[in-house]
Amino acid sequence: MRKITMRHSRTSILQRAALAFGLLTTSVVPTAVAPSEIEYYTFPSIYGGTIDTKQWQGKPYLVVNTASQCAFTKQYASLQKLYDKYREAGFGMVAVPSDDFNQEFDSDAEVKSFCELNYDIDMPMSETLSVRGQDAHQFFKAVKTESGFAPKWNFNKILIGVDGTVIDTWGSLTRPLSAKLTKAIEDELSKSQ
């Protein structure tokens, strides 16, 4: 049985409003899942070629749906810092630009240029993809099936653990360098040593 929990029984009005608009998500505690069900997916890379999550077999990785014209776009800088902080330990990340919320540029060339010029991004980034609904990329469909989570807005974060299962998800309001996100990554990295 899947269980959705809140870390605090009392939530502020701001938190409840953010939750209602999909900016904040609750923790998802998935049931045991065979690792192959979520573990390996490929994404078309915005730089050419593909990003294969198999390269992080036995290591945690974070998938974040992004947008270049969103109030949360400044999180790109923190995402790059997060990637830089843990990549030598084997941590992986995929930024997935999406126009599902009508806040992305019309072309991948514009997205790539914007991210490189404004945020000096070198983390793995896919081409613009759908992250929810019928047209969602297979990774997001698998996450929805296994954990019930689908992005409710831009900059939602999905941590895949060393065993290939969804460890946790976070909404837009969770900063990439937040204590809860970095602790979850560190916990998973300690399992992969």
Which residues make up each language-model segment?
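Bacterial N-terminal signal peptides that target proteins for export
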Residues: 4-18
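Bacterial N-terminal signal peptides
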Residues: 16-27
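Bacterial Sec-dependent signal peptides at the C-terminal "C-region" and cleavage site
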Residues: 25-37
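A short beta-strand-turn-helix
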Residues: 41-60, 83-86
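Short pre-active-site segment immediately N-terminal to redox-active cysteine/selenocysteine motifs
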Residues: 59, 66-69, 97-100
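Structural microenvironment flanking redox-active thiols in thiol-disulfide oxidoreductases
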Residues: 72-136
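Thiol-/selenol-based redox modules, centered on thioredoxin-like
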Residues: 141, 146-193
